[in-house]
């Protein structure tokens, strides 16, 4: 058996932190686990990430954006996610296909039926077992990310994930993304686990761990190497 867990949420929701904490917890318990992200996680995906998130690429067409994200996902599924799941491991992914529906579908107004066809091709129909949604309003999440970016060093741009081209869009765009997530959750409630992102990091990590725990009984732990 294997387990595929994804983390979704608006900008500044803390999903990346929670994905990392769950990875560290499972790794410490000797479970076969990897942590990856979208876009990225592969050499090709990381190159695409630089292109789609670069603040200077304001001329990018919505269709190009949608296809680039999907291309990065296709490479990640083929190179990393599917092979590890086939070995019986646990894959934790910071964003997955739901992000494309929320950001490019609802956010940019792309046709959802078209997105379903493209996503099916990119993923081969691979769906997460659990998707955590860290719930915070678009306005509050963006303010969190602005504060975090202000504390970071270095120039904001292609090499800095603290503030990117999608973050820089108007608040109304991010509110459409937030509303889109709620539509996705309502359409598939058994897969989604909605958590209040305004809680402490520790409280969220404890809740996520408790939700994942029942799924671990079927996962074979790694042997201790002496």
From Swiss-Prot:
Q: SUPFAM superfamilies, alphabetically? A: P-loop containing nucleoside triphosphate hydrolases
Q: Which GO terms describe its molecular function?
A: ATP binding; dTMP kinase activity
Q: Which reaction does this chain catalyze?
A: dTMP + ATP = dTDP + ADP
- Chain's role: Phosphorylation of dTMP to form dTDP in both de novo and salvage pathways of dTTP synthesis.
User: This protein is called what?
Assistant: Thymidylate kinase
Q: Where does ATP bind?
A: 9-16
Q: Which PROSITE patterns match?
A: THYMIDYLATE_KINASE
Q: Which HAMAP family match?
A: Thymidylate_kinase (MF_00165)
Q: Which family does it belong to?
A: Belongs to the thymidylate kinase family.
Q: Which gene encodes it?
A: tmk
Cellular component GO terms, alphabetical: cytosol
Native species: Roseiflexus sp. (strain RS-1)
Q: Name one GO biological process term.
A: dTTP biosynthetic process
What InterPro entries does its record include? P-loop_NTPase, Thymidylate_kin-like_dom, Thymidylate_kin_CS, Thymidylate_kinase
Q: Which domain of life is it from?
A: Bacteria
Q: Per its UniProt record, what Pfam families does this chain match?
A: Thymidylate_kin
Q: Which UniProt keywords apply?
A: ATP-binding, Kinase, Nucleotide biosynthesis, Nucleotide-binding, Transferase
Tell me its EC number(s), please.
2.7.4.9
Report whether Kinase shows up as a keyword of the record.
Answer: yes
């Amino acid at each position: 058996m294997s387990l595929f867990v994804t983390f979704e949420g608006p900008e500044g929701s803390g999903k990346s932190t929670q994905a990392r904490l769950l990875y560290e917890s499972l790794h410490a318990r000797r479970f076969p686990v990897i942590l990856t992200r979208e876009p990225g996680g592969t050499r090709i995906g990381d190159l695409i990430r630089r292109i789609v998130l670069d603040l200077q690429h304001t001329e990018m067409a919505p269709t190009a954006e949608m296809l680039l994200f999907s291309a990065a996902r296709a490479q990640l599924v083929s190179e990393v996610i599917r092979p590890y799941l086939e070995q019986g491991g646990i894959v934790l992914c910071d964003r997955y296909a739901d992000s494309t529906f929320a950001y490019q579908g609802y956010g940019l107004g792309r046709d959802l039926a078209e997105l379903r066809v493209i996503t099916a091709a990119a993923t081969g129909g691979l769906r997460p077992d659990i998707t955590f949604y860290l719930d915070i309003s678009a306005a509050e999440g963006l303010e969190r990310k602005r504060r975090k970016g202000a504390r970071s060093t270095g120039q904001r741009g292609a090499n800095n994930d603290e503030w990117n081209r999608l973050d820089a869009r108007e608040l109304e765009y991010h509110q459409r993304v937030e509303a889109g997530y709620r539509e996705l959750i309502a359409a598939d409630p058994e897969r989604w686990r909605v958590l209040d992102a305004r809680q402490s990091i520790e409280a969220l990590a404890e809740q996520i761990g408790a939700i994942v725990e029942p799924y671990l009984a079927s996962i074979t732990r790694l042997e201790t190497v002496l």
